[in-house]
Amino acid sequence: MNLNATLFAQMVVFLVLAWFTMKFVWPPLINALDERSKKIADGLAAAEKGKAELDAAHKRVDQELAQARNDGQQRIADAEKRAQAVAEEIKANAQAEAARIVAQAKAEAEQQIVKAREALRGEVAALAVKGAEQILKREVDQTAHAQLLNQLKAEL
C-alpha cells in the first residue's frame, strides 16, 4: 500500500470537514430535530389532554341530561299531583254545590207543598162552609143531602 501526500491531505480535509460539521452543522440539525420532537410530543400531549377533556365533557353532559330527565319527570309528577288535587277539590266543590242545590230544591218543594196544603185547606173549608150553608138552606131530607154531598165530592 502506497501512502502519499494526497491521502494525508484527504484525511486532513476529511477531519476538518468532520470537525466543521460537528461544530457548526450538527448542533442546528440536532436542535431542529429536538424542537420537532418536542412539538410532536406537545401535540400528542395536547391531543391526550383534549381527549380527556372531551371524555370529561361527555360525562358531564350525560350527567346533566340525566339530571334534567329526572327533574322533568319530577316536575311532571308534581304537576300530575297538583292536577289531581285540583280535580278532587273541584269534584268536592261540585258535590257540595249539588247537595246545596238539592237541599234548596227540597226546601222550595216543601214550601210549595205547605202552601198547596194551606190553599187546599182553605178551599176545603170554603167548600165545607158552602156545603153546610146549602144543606142548611134546604130541607133536611136524605136524597137532597146525598145529592149535595155528591156535588161537593165532584167539586173537590
From Swiss-Prot:
CDD domains: ATP-synt_Fo_b. It is a single-pass membrane protein. One of its GO terms (molecular function) is proton-transporting ATP synthase activity, rotational mechanism. GO terms for cellular component: plasma membrane; proton-transporting ATP synthase complex. Its main location: membrane. Keywords: ATP synthesis, Cell inner membrane, Cell membrane, CF(0), Hydrogen ion transport, Ion transport, Membrane, Transmembrane, Transmembrane helix, Transport. The keyword Cell inner membrane applies. The keyword Metal-binding does not apply. It is found in: Cell inner membrane. The chain crosses the membrane at residues 7-29. InterPro entries: ATP_synth_B-like_membr_sf, ATP_synth_b/b'su_bac/chlpt, ATP_synth_F0_bsu_bac, ATP_synthase_B_chain. SUPFAM superfamilies: F1F0 ATP synthase subunit B, membrane domain. It comes from the Bacteria. F-type ATPases have 2 components, F(1) - the catalytic core - and F(0) - the membrane proton channel. F(1) has five subunits: alpha(3), beta(3), gamma(1), delta(1), epsilon(1). F(0) has three main subunits: a(1), b(2) and c(10-14). The alpha and beta chains form an alternating ring which encloses part of the gamma chain. F(1) is attached to F(0) by a central stalk formed by the gamma and epsilon chains, while a peripheral stalk is formed by the delta and b chains. F(1)F(0) ATP synthase produces ATP from ADP in the presence of a proton or sodium gradient. F-type ATPases consist of two structural domains, F(1) containing the extramembraneous catalytic core and F(0) containing the membrane proton channel, linked together by a central stalk and a peripheral stalk. During catalysis, ATP synthesis in the catalytic domain of F(1) is coupled via a rotary mechanism of the central stalk subunits to proton translocation. Belongs to the ATPase B chain family. This is ATP synthase subunit b. It comes from Burkholderia cenocepacia (strain HI2424).
